Amino acid sequence: MQLPALQSATLIRRYKRFLADIELPTGDVMTIHCANTGAMTGCGEKGDKIWYSHSDSQTRKYPHSWELTQLANGQLCCINTHRSNQLVFEALQNKQIKELAMYDEIYPEVKYGEENSRIDFLLKGEGLLDCYVEVKSITLVKGNLGMSPDAVTTRGQKHVRELLAMKKQGHRAVVLFAGLHNGFDRFKIAEYIDPEYDRLLKEAMEQGVEAYAYAGQFEISNEIPTALSLTESVSYIK
């Protein structure tokens, strides 16, 4: 997935969930949009180097968006969780998700379920069970362990219930955890953050719902991040 043209700055603070103040290399201060509703643990600290993009939209109050954080150890994390579905869509098209590579038809944002939900992707293929795929981001990393979620997610809990219902109706149901951080090679659910999500997903997996985690990798050109892709599945610790 190609990233938009990026410029760097220093994070001053994030506030009101969707806003951040940054200091430009010129010393000027600018407010930008933050498309992340999570806690952003470890990837949104004062003084962090961040990368932001610009939009030409005339309707946006804040035309710049926080895209990436570059950590002190050099690792990168895409904090714009809107990118996760773009990333997975490209990976599905390119048959990079081996567990789903047999599907040829990809339908994004399809209404389904009894709780008024939209599935991120509905996959279809001749002679195959329909496959409902819910995408979740991995931005929380400790050591080399990626975790999700980074905040309590009642929406995520609802999605697990909906997926289990689809499985019981005879379809495939998958939670795909997409790496937006390039510093992990193992994955587990952050049960200490959202024990209910952990419980629901474990119970769903016992009844046939599938869950996979994929690592992310950034491409760098002239010291500027230019692309992000999913590389390979990582060990899923249950």
Swiss-Prot record:
InterPro entries: SfsA, SfsA_C, SfsA_N. It comes from the Bacteria. One of its GO terms (molecular function) is DNA binding. Pfam families: SfsA, SfsA_N. Belongs to the SfsA family. HAMAP family: SfsA. This is Sugar fermentation stimulation protein homolog. It comes from Haemophilus influenzae (strain ATCC 51907 / DSM 11121 / KW20 / Rd). The lineage of its organism: Bacteria, Pseudomonadati, Pseudomonadota, Gammaproteobacteria, Pasteurellales.
